[in-house]
């Protein structure tokens, strides 16, 4: 059976292979092999190299397929379209009755020769995108005491929201790109991701690909959606354009496919939106750094969970450990998980919080020496007795909590009362969870003081799970970076920086009380807690 060090080495090795493989895959995505100079017959040449005069036209229709210019509306026409110049224009779009009744409205974007109608141009390229999507409206927040709402919504919208059913929303942004590189493809090995966006034409003896028109679906964010009701007749649409390189185009196609796959696996529109935000709102170079940071975060999460579980699994006594701090960590972790769940936070944050809550519940069972015996169908919970050494630790623990309660309880109660009077919530449950979590975030570090006090009284920190602490500290510093990237509640973001301060205090105590693991303390125990070897 693998030892702990071997298992850790194996995990780190697998992690290194994973990172190397991912880097190789990413290189394969952004790098495209050009057509060799000697194989001109098999090359696919760019039509844009001829520098044609182009025009951009955007139409809307309720039909997913159009054969001619009937039943379509022209909403934007850009003559003398320059593929090198970015622009952004806002137009008003008429909303048909069919769309107002939860129907779909499509945008047809044509790139064609200037002065020629799209359906009369044999070398036009076009792409289709729905301008509507279906999503459950965000619950309205009200003042729980007065019933005053944050927004004056139309009564029909309130009734629709109450049904908790998806309704039609308007995508107010349309982001377009054209691949502008004069890149010569090898016809025998066209990249599959780009190939589906390419349209070929035969010009003389050579094959050319027409301009590659692309819609950036990653820019469609939940914050830009607008609810469509029966009285809506016109809505704004912001059309923006920018050129794109081949490498970024291929990367963006893969990211869009990944987001689509997440939605097929059950991710909601909001969950997918969190992932989109990582790519759209972040510089690509910073995004590459974020990938490596996220990979290390995953590794440290795994190692922290593993070492924490290993430490508590072998823990035979609570000497030097604050039981109340363990109980508090369990309570705060569960409350934070429920809060993140209520706020519909990204699964990237929610899943680790849920795993952490389960581990903290198990640690409480170990700390209280709790056993469950079944008497028929009725469970009977029993708690183990504490020895004299553990009672001494509990005495320090109780002493710290006594003074702490004088400060903590008034602050938490006052904060909850203030938020009830001045802040609007979706429900009483939402207020209760928010009050708890604000207490956890704002004053939670105070509950770490009992453990610091126990360390001070015992003049030792050898009883703490330092390996798990170290991995968690690394993740805390990584969380500081993610706090500016991943969408999360502001209080959760501030808590990341609070944990930095707490860990620095633990480091100071470790320096102040050097650990001698071979030393037997005043209770006759070694903090190494090595299992006794059986005599042969």
From Swiss-Prot:
One of the GO biological process terms: apoptotic process
InterPro entries in UniProt: CLPTM1
An example molecular function term from Gene Ontology annotations: phospholipid scramblase activity
Keywords: Apoptosis, Endoplasmic reticulum, Glycoprotein, Lipid transport, Membrane, Transmembrane, Transmembrane helix, Transport
Residues listed as glycosylation sites in the UniProt record: 92, 102, 229
Major site of localization recorded for this protein: endoplasmic reticulum
Similarity-based family: Belongs to the CLPTM1 family.
GO CC, alphabetical: endomembrane system; endoplasmic reticulum membrane; membrane
Localization of this protein: Endoplasmic reticulum membrane
Functional description taken from the UniProt entry: Scramblase that mediates the translocation of glucosaminylphosphatidylinositol (alpha-D-GlcN-(1-6)-(1,2-diacyl-sn-glycero-3-phospho)-1D-myo-inositol, GlcN-PI) across the endoplasmic reticulum (ER) membrane, from the cytosolic leaflet to the luminal leaflet of the ER membrane, where it participates in the biosynthesis of glycosylphosphatidylinositol (GPI). GPI is a lipid glycoconjugate involved in post-translational modification of proteins.
Encoding gene (name): CLPTM1L
Positions in the Cytoplasmic compartment: 1-9, 306-324, 365-402, 450-536
Residue ranges crossing the lipid bilayer per the database entry: 10-30, 285-305, 325-342, 347-364, 403-423, 429-449
Name of the protein in its database record: Lipid scramblase CLPTM1L
Membrane disposition: Multi-pass membrane protein
Regions of this protein lying in the Extracellular compartment: 31-284, 343-346, 424-428
Organism domain of life: Eukaryota
Species this protein is from: Gallus gallus (Chicken)
Known catalytic reactions: a 6-(alpha-D-glucosaminyl)-1-(1,2-diacyl-sn-glycero-3-phospho)-1D-myo-inositol(in) = a 6-(alpha-D-glucosaminyl)-1-(1,2-diacyl-sn-glycero-3-phospho)-1D-myo-inositol(out); 6-(alpha-D-glucosaminyl)-(1-octadecanoyl,2-(9Z)-octadecenoyl-sn-glycero-3-phospho)-1D-myo-inositol(in) = 6-(alpha-D-glucosaminyl)-(1-octadecanoyl,2-(9Z)-octadecenoyl-sn-glycero-3-phospho)-1D-myo-inositol(out); a 1,2-diacyl-sn-glycero-3-phospho-(1D-myo-inositol)(in) = a 1,2-diacyl-sn-glycero-3-phospho-(1D-myo-inositol)(out); a 1,2-diacyl-sn-glycero-3-phosphocholine(in) = a 1,2-diacyl-sn-glycero-3-phosphocholine(out)
